[in-house]
A protein has these predicted regions:
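Surface-exposed loop/interface segments of Gram-negative outer-membrane beta-barrel transport/assembly proteins
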Residues: 29-82, 122-127, 133, 137-222, ...
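Transmembrane beta-strand segments that form the barrel wall of outer-membrane beta-barrel proteins
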Residues: 39, 115-121, 363-375
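Conserved interaction-surface patches within small, structured recognition/assembly domains
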Residues: 95, 99, 119-120, 349-350, ...
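Short, solvent-exposed loop/turn segments at the edges of secondary structure
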Residues: 15-17, 276-278, 382-384
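Residues on the lipid-exposed face of transmembrane beta-strands in outer-membrane beta-barrel proteins
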Residues: 24, 100-104, 134-140, 225-231, ...
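A beta-strand signature from Gram-negative outer-membrane beta-barrel systems
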Residues: 1-36, 95-97, 110, 116-118
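Outer-membrane beta-barrel initiation region
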Residues: 49-50, 56, 88-92, 102-106
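Extended, hydrophobic alpha-helical segments in both membrane/secreted and soluble proteins
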Residues: 134-136, 241, 281, 349-353, ...
């Protein structure tokens, strides 16, 4: 993590909140193939349930003291005592993670390939998370002065949850605070209490029934791939060119079942789909040398270009009359729609010089010029520089 001005100025306008430098795993040249399998099994739960909430007897006593006891059958209600923390949070939500990797190399090649699967139930009832991940890092020596490589990652993830509704009082976290202890979410036969038959006594929706009848699913695909070539045409000079592509595709599907009475026999569906593509090219030249074994110099110049594009759509229709046919085309009216588009580009030039005297004194200077389509029309370029001594 880079936070100081001297370290981050070389990254320009986008480094105002710091820079995170990530080093990916890779194999070692000349090392035999090594296969590694890891697995993780466990569970997650609410860190603490020691919340001082009223039970039914305390709630009844409170209502009597403040005059809210009119029309209440407390003899019947006193037989019900619901801890809503136990109803809307999973006590031990299971998780499982499996990872298989292979790494190694020859005299001219190193590689690291891995795949993983992660599955977890959320601590909130009705939520799940699933992810599949693949990664491949390969580097090869073309000759004595040139090496090429690629780092590629693909991720698929799926999230299931419930819509939180217009007011969110029946969302899991809110429900644990606002539902009263004598509001039983279940009938005597174990099925969910509903407003339809009067089995639900709450003044808002039954949170568990709402979650079941208003599901929301999200899916995300992400592909990040980087290709690079690094040359050392002469001693102490390193030239590197790198091209990366970051692509993401996200979809969501929300359904509101018409058979659920709070939906007023009026189903709904919402679909959204968004695509993002970020292309980046970076070229750098780095020259380092030493004089008299105590004076160390390092100079670097570079160029970077970024082209970003994001677009998608979101459509909501209402009027579905069948719980099975809750797609967009089954609705009678389109209640909302949108199609956002975002585009911008960057072009940057930068340089840095470093001096080190006998590992005792250090000085550096960096400068960067950023040109961006997001800057004002009267000033498309910005300069960023820093000087440091130590």
């Amino acid at each position: 993590m880079l936070k100081d001005a001297s370290s981050t100025s070389i990254y320009g306008a986008r480094a105002s909140n710091g820079v995170v430098v990530i080093t990916s795993k890779r194999g070692r040249m000349g090392e035999a193939a090594k296969i590694t399998f890891r697995t993780q099994l466990g569970f997650s739960q609410l860190a603490s349930k020691d919340w001082d909430q009223m039970d039914t007897n305390e709630r009844i006593q409170f209502e009597k003291e403040v005059g809210l006891d009119k029309g209440q059958d407390y003899e019947k209600l006193s037989k019900i005592n619901i801890n809503w923390l136990d109803k809307v949070y999973n006590d031990k939500a299971p998780l499982q993670n499996y990872e298989l990797s292979v790494n190694g190399g020859t005299e001219k090649l190193n590689y690291y390939v891995s795949g993983s699967y992660y599955d977890q139930d959320g601590i909130a009832v009705g939520s799940t998370f699933e992810r599949v991940n693949f990664r491949a890092n390969v580097e090869a020596k073309a000759n004595k002065w040139l090496k090429i490589g690629t780092n590629t990652m693909f991720t698929y993830q799926e999230v299931e949850q419930s819509d939180d509704g217009e007011y969110a009082l029946w969302a899991p976290i809110s429900a644990s605070f606002f539902m009263l202890p004598y509001w039983n979410p279940y009938k005597e036969d174990g099925s969910l209490a509903l407003q339809d038959d009067g089995s639900w006594k709450g003044t808002t929706e039954n949170p568990l029934a709402w979650m079941e009848n208003n599901p929301l699913s999200n899916k995300k695909y992400k592909l990040l791939s980087t290709f690079y070539a690094e040359a050392t045409p002469i001693k102490n000079l390193t030239i590197r060119s790198q091209l990366s592509a970051d692509y993401g595709h996200t979809t969501s599907f929300y359904r509101s079942f018409p058979s659920y009475k709070p939906n007023n026999n009026y189903g709904g569906a919402q679909r959204s789909s968004y695509d993002m593509l970020n292309l980046m090219i970076t070229n750098t030249a780095n020259y380092r040398f030493m004089l008299n074994d105590v004076h160390s110099f390092n100079f670097m110049v570079g160029q970077e270009g970024v082209d970003y594009h994001y677009e998608g759509f979101q459509v909501t229709t209402r009027g579905q009359t069948n719980d099975i046919l809750t797609n967009l085309s089954s609705g009678s009216t389109a209640s909302s729609w949108g199609d956002p588009v975002t585009e911008y580009s960057f072009l940057s030039f930068f340089g840095r010089g470093e001096y080190n005297y006998d590992d005792r004194y250090y000085a550096d200077f960096s400068v960067r010029g950023d040109g961006s389509s997001r800057f004002g029309t009267d000033k498309h370029w910005g300069a960023f520089w820093s000087v440091g001594f130590m």
